[in-house]
C-alpha cells in the first residue's frame, strides 16, 4: 500500500529535527540531488525579478491624461509630435487618456511631455 503525501507529511511533522536532517541526507544520496542546490537556484530567481524591476526603465510611453483648457494648442502639439493629421490628432485629444507615442527614449519622452505640458495638457510617462 502506497503512502499518501498527507501521511508522509504527518510522519515528518512528528520527527525530531535531527531525524529530518538525516532523512534529507538519505534522500539526497538515494536520488542524487541536493536540497541546497534547489534553494540556491530558487533564491537568485527571486532576486533577479527584484533587480529587473529596480533597473532603470529605458523605454517610455507618453500618455495624454487630459487636454486641459487649451485644447487647440494641445491638438497642434500632438500633430507636431506624432505627424498625425488634424482629424486623427483631434480624435486622440478628445479620447484622452490616450497614448501619444510609445517606446521612446527617456530624453525623447521628456521632450514630448514638456511640449504637451507647455500646450496645456496633463501628461504621464509610463
From Swiss-Prot:
Q: Which Gene3D superfamilies match?
A: 3.30.1390.10, Single helix bin (1.20.5.710)
Q: Which UniProt keywords apply?
A: Ribonucleoprotein, Ribosomal protein
**InterPro entries per the record?**
Ribosomal_bL12, Ribosomal_bL12_C, Ribosomal_bL12_C/ClpS-like, Ribosomal_bL12_oligo, Ribosomal_bL12_oligo_N_sf
- Quote the function comment for this protein: Forms part of the ribosomal stalk which helps the ribosome interact with GTP-bound translation factors. Is thus essential for accurate translation.
User: Which protein family is it in?
Assistant: Belongs to the bacterial ribosomal protein bL12 family.
**How does this protein assemble?**
Homodimer. Part of the ribosomal stalk of the 50S ribosomal subunit. Forms a multimeric L10(L12)X complex, where L10 forms an elongated spine to which 2 to 4 L12 dimers bind in a sequential fashion. Binds GTP-bound translation factors.
GO BP, sorted A to Z: translation
Q: Which Gene Ontology MF annotations are present?
A: mRNA binding; structural constituent of ribosome
Record bears the keyword Thylakoid: no
What Pfam families does this protein's entry cite?
Answer: Ribosomal_L12, Ribosomal_L12_N
Q: What is this protein called?
A: Large ribosomal subunit protein bL12
| HAMAP family xref list | Ribosomal_bL12
Q: Which GO terms describe its cellular component?
A: cytosolic large ribosomal subunit
Amino acid at each position: 500500500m502506497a503512502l499518501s503525501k498527507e501521511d508522509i507529511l504527518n510522519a515528518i511533522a512528528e520527527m525530531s529535527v535531527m531525524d529530518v536532517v538525516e532523512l534529507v541526507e538519505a534522500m539526497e544520496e538515494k536520488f542524487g540531488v541536493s536540497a541546497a542546490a534547489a534553494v540556491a537556484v530558487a533564491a537568485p530567481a527571486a532576486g533577479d525579478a527584484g533587480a529587473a524591476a529596480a533597473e532603470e526603465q529605458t523605454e517610455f510611453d507618453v500618455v495624454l491624461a487630459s487636454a486641459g483648457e487649451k485644447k487647440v494648442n494641445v491638438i497642434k502639439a500632438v500633430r507636431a509630435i506624432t505627424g498625425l493629421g488634424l482629424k486623427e490628432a483631434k480624435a486622440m485629444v478628445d479620447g484622452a487618456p490616450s497614448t501619444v507615442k510609445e517606446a521612446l527614449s527617456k530624453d525623447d519622452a521628456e521632450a514630448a511631455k514638456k511640449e504637451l505640458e507647455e500646450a496645456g495638457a496633463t501628461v504621464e510617462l509610463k
